[in-house]
């Protein structure tokens, strides 16, 4: 018999971050933890840290979103796109993902979790630049900020925002992207730290406005 998959216990902070959506978040996390490695969505080391490193890390971005249409680039397993859609039913999401098996997983979870605010588009970001006029765009662990700018800005309306999850090198990535920031007319570029005092691993976001 295969060894049972051990999923990290739900952190106490999860309930306050998801509010009345916590049951949906629990179901998604259970599904991803039990089936994610088999489907090639997460690695074998992830279930024991699934809540803290992935789900909580993603949901901390939810307060930065505003009602409208948000695109998530390279959604993969649904991080952060599905997690944010669970936490913010008042926001519409389009999850943009090129890999067929990941798209199948996302579509299955959208139906299973009854997420009426989510659509899934199988494509690369650069292939759908003319299709969308997003209010905001998110991405997590996709590429360096300088490379993400030309992929994401064409999807966003004037006055819209990039809300891109980054690691501890966020400030350096912003410095390295100075040419792209000017070329693509980004303003109010800032690094925001989320979760201080709530979680052990904070979430860093680069936020910028498309002028």
UniProtKB/Swiss-Prot annotation:
Q: Which InterPro entries match?
A: rRNA_ssu_MeTfrase_G, SAM-dependent_MTases_sf
Q: Which Pfam families match?
A: GidB (PF02527)
- Localization per Swiss-Prot or TrEMBL: Cytoplasm
Q: What is its EC number?
A: 2.1.1.-
Question: This protein's superkingdom?
Answer: Bacteria
Q: Cellular component per GO? A: cytosol
Per UniProt, the keywords (alphabetical) are:
Cytoplasm, Methyltransferase, rRNA processing, S-adenosyl-L-methionine, Transferase
Taking the first listed entry, what is the main subcellular location of this protein, grouped into a coarse class?
Answer: cytoplasm
Chain positions recorded as S-adenosyl-L-methionine binding sites: 74, 79, 125-126, 140
Q: Which molecular-function annotations from GO does this UniProt entry contain? A: rRNA (guanine-N7-)-methyltransferase activity
Protein's job: Specifically methylates the N7 position of guanine in position 518 of 16S rRNA.
Family label: Belongs to the methyltransferase superfamily. RNA methyltransferase RsmG family.
What's the name of the protein? Ribosomal RNA small subunit methyltransferase G
Source species of the chain: Clavibacter michiganensis subsp. michiganensis (strain NCPPB 382)
